[in-house]
Amino acid sequence: MARDKIALIGSGQIGGTLAHLVGLKELGDVVMFDIAEGVPQGKALDIAQSSPVDGFDAHYTGANSYEALDNAKVCIVTAGVPRKPGMSRDDLLSINLKVMEQVGAGIKKYAPDAFVICITNPLDAMVWALQKASGLPAKKVVGMAGVLDSARFRYFLADEFNVSVEDVTAFVLGGHGDTMVPLTKYSTVAGIPLPDLVKMGWTSQARIDEIVDRTRNGGAEIVNLLKTGSAYYAPAASAIAMAESYLRDKKRVLPCAAYLNGEFGVKDMYVGVPVVIGSKGVERIVEIELAGKDREAFDKSVAAVQGLVDACKKIAPDLLGR
């Protein structure tokens, strides 16, 4: 039985980590694409040579032509300019929008049936642009944001309570930026909601608020520490979880930047919400109830994403006609 083909568009730190994880999880063969000659070829060869040690069979190739994407089952897009210290995700908009137009055209031509995961920032605007540029069905194009943000939230909570991360569930909704919405109401430890844990004396509301703020600034914290780059291990692991749910029809409930067309009162926009990912792509949007401060925070986050999308429309008005 032929292995699935996974195309990684962008061969930087995240791309390389993705390629290794695909092999370790035996998800399929890998094509690494990048415009920098030699980089995808070199990384592909390096990772392929780790396979005898790690014990997996997969074929790795590097390419500088979009033709290499031909018939890919999954495309994961990391191409674009990385975030640097002092640079907001929004500052990246103009440069990376052009990249998404080029990548979208390549996917449309060579991998029109693929499930596409976008990681490029500013995420919510870039996945919107990528879907428009590629013309793929919205349910087959998603953004990796909520899985990562929720993982950070879960890690911080597990560390606070000194429990296994496996026993912590948490959802982060909204845009992938400073206005993201970590939902304490729907976050639990062994099924016990965070508000109840506060009442039980396990922690204080002030401490939970600090963890929420740290989650919102999780990416910036790493950028400031690294000084010359941004996070790549956790983002790659998050995208692989999404790809695996699609390839193996696991139907996991994952928070992703998904296309909304009326859900949550939002239309024609990608925003982070819980979705079910299976072999058909986004198979269901989980429209949870939001009220009070949570609803206000979500609406504020949606407004921030809308601002980015509006900026995209001004920069590349031709995207609207696709």
UniProtKB/Swiss-Prot annotation:
Sequence similarity: Belongs to the LDH/MDH superfamily. MDH type 3 family.
Organism: Bradyrhizobium sp. (strain ORS 278)
Free-text function comment from the UniProt entry: Catalyzes the reversible oxidation of malate to oxaloacetate.
Chemical reaction(s) catalysed: (S)-malate + NAD(+) = oxaloacetate + NADH + H(+)
The keyword NAD appears for this protein: yes
UniProt key word NAD: yes
Origin organism lineage: Bacteria, Pseudomonadati, Pseudomonadota, Alphaproteobacteria, Hyphomicrobiales
Entry protein name: Malate dehydrogenase
Gene Ontology terms describing biological process: lactate metabolic process; tricarboxylic acid cycle
Catalytic EC class: oxidoreductase
Keyword tags: NAD, Oxidoreductase, Tricarboxylic acid cycle
UniProt GO molecular function: L-lactate dehydrogenase activity; L-malate dehydrogenase (NAD+) activity
